[in-house]
Amino acid sequence: MTCVVEMRNPPHPGELIGDSLKELGVSVSKAARGLGITRQQLHNVIAGRSAITPEMALRLEKALGSTADMWLRMQMNFDLAQLRARASSIKIKRFEPDAA
């Protein structure tokens, strides 16, 4: 049996990237060069202003030893939590079977 724990307000995965770089003693500039992206791109992800794309997830997998799947799941969980927080503003009616 699989147990899934849902976080109500998960952090943006960029926070984990920033924490990981600090633990490793790697600057944002050095990490960006190693990832083959600009410093600004990495800064935007760490600051939570940009999402982790599948390509970025694969780059992180190669650089940090984590899996691309993990990064994408974290991003999806963050995005879904943000949407759920404003779900009441999305006006959708449930589909009902057509009366025959």
PLM regions: where:
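A short, Lys/Arg-rich alpha-helix, primarily the initiator
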Residues: 2-26, 73
